[in-house]
A protein has these predicted regions:
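Compact, charge-rich alpha-helical regulatory domains located at protein termini
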Residues: 1-24
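Conserved active-site and cofactor/substrate-binding residues in soluble primary-metabolism enzymes
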Residues: 5-8, 33-40, 80, 95-102, ...
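Structured loop/turn residues at beta-strand edges in well-structured enzyme cores
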Residues: 8, 113, 188
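Structural signal for hydrophobic packing residues in well-ordered secondary-structure cores
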Residues: 17, 21, 42-51, 104, ...
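N-terminal entrance/gating region of PLP-dependent enzymes' catalytic architecture
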Residues: 19-102
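Conserved beta-loop-alpha segment that forms the PLP phosphate-binding cup at the N-terminus of a helix
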Residues: 34-39, 104, 116-140
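Short loop-beta-helix segment that forms the pyridoxal 5′-phosphate
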Residues: 88-92, 96, 109-128
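Conserved PLP-enzyme active-site core in the AAT-like
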Residues: 125-234
Length: 234
């Protein structure tokens, strides 16, 4: 093969790489493991951690205990469910359209909404899009979001807003973990106010009071959440 491509040694293939950038010795890695050995190794590592049905998890921040039905794994094994891309050819995506319809129906019932959309990648992008929609509807250029919203959500919103020139304001939280709604009075001409409940700390916000205060200032109210199943209790 080397003769076919016109070189004498394997090192000639890397001649464009400076010698001081080349690895001089073997990589500092353990010996390779078979799949069986690797499985045993990972089980041993997992056994060192306090986890499992015998423990209660209070990590929070999006890490919650869930029961996942076996049907979920089966459905995820089907190629038409691997992507969150919205199908535009219904004759090619009947299974995906069925799943989206079921999701929207259940989400609308759970949240008490007339309609629900499924064409967003996750809650963070949906939050950002909702705030941008509020700006378009109201014609205002400022929004306020609670700092008790999950940090990953807030980072996505900041990324969306970075090139727009719109103003993104923070609502602080109190020692109780709840959003300081009184600070809304310090902001004027807001297009929207966003609050998450249950919030990042697991506190249940007074969503009705937050919405009424936002509406009093002419702003739209955006309610976010990271754990949809919490609304089965709330």
């Amino acid at each position: 093969m080397l003769r076919a491509i016109g070189v004498d040694h394997l090192d000639d293939l890397f001649s464009t790489i400076p010698k001081d950038c080349r690895l001089k010795g073997a990589l500092n890695l353990p010996e390779p493991l078979s799949e069986w050995e690797l499985n045993d190794h990972m089980d041993a590592l997992a056994g060192r951690m306090a986890a499992g049905p015998g423990y209660q998890a209070f990590v929070g921040a999006g890490r919650y205990e869930h029961f996942i039905s076996a049907s979920v794994s089966s459905l995820l094994g089907r190629s038409e469910f691997v992507t969150s891309y919205t199908p535009y050819q219904p004759e090619m995506s009947q299974g995906t359209l069925q799943a989206i319809y079921e999701y929207q129906t259940l989400a609308a019932r759970l949240l008490g909404m007339e309609v629900a959309t499924a064409s967003h990648y996750d809650g963070a992008t949906a939050l950002a899009e909702a705030l941008l929609m509020a700006i378009r509807i109201t014609g205002r250029r400022r929004v306020a979001i609670s700092r008790a919203i999950h940090p990953h959500y807030r980072q996505v919103v900041r990324t969306y807003f970075a090139p727009t020139g719109y103003e993104l304001l923070d609502l602080p939280f109190l020692k109780t973990g709840l959003t300081d709604l009184d600070r809304m009075n310090d902001f004027h001409d807001l297009a929207a106010v966003a609050v998450q409940s249950p919030n990042f700390f697991g506190c249940v916000e007074d969503v009705r009071a937050a919405a009424e205060q936002a509406h009093a200032g002419g702003a739209l109210f955006v309610a976010g959440f990271t754990e949809a199943l919490a609304f089965g209790l709330l």
